[in-house]
Amino acid sequence: DDIKIYLLNLFKAATAEQFCAIYLSKNERILFKEVYTDNDKNGVSVDMIPFSRSFSNVKPYAVVIAHNHPSGNPAPSVRDDTATEKLAMLFSLNNVRLYDHLIVGATDVFSYRMDGRLDKIIRSANLRFAGL
């Protein structure tokens, strides 16, 4: 619940989508936080190269990713699912655990982990790797 309150406050004034990465140690302490935006009201894209550099330098055990939906509706889109899968693959290649993907709306936060979607996406990403 603390992270939900933090994220609701972080994104409450945002008029465009923003993406936040919270890097965690093995004992779930925050090592580093980073916020990305490209000032697009319809979505946010994360450039994988600087993002990869950041978590390569920090060397987290796990990462929580979060972004806002300025519309106020935290329901995930197909685009959100696709981005989650790409990030899950990137983290897996680097032995980093994707702890959760949170989507922040006006008053509520959607959790991929709590909804069960995260496990499905990670399994799907792992199956794709197995086929390479």
Residue ranges and their predicted role:
Residues 2-5, 27, 37, 41-132:
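Active-site-proximal loop/helix of nucleotide/amide-processing enzymes and allied scaffolds
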Residues 1-32, 36:
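Long amphipathic N-terminal alpha/beta scaffold segment
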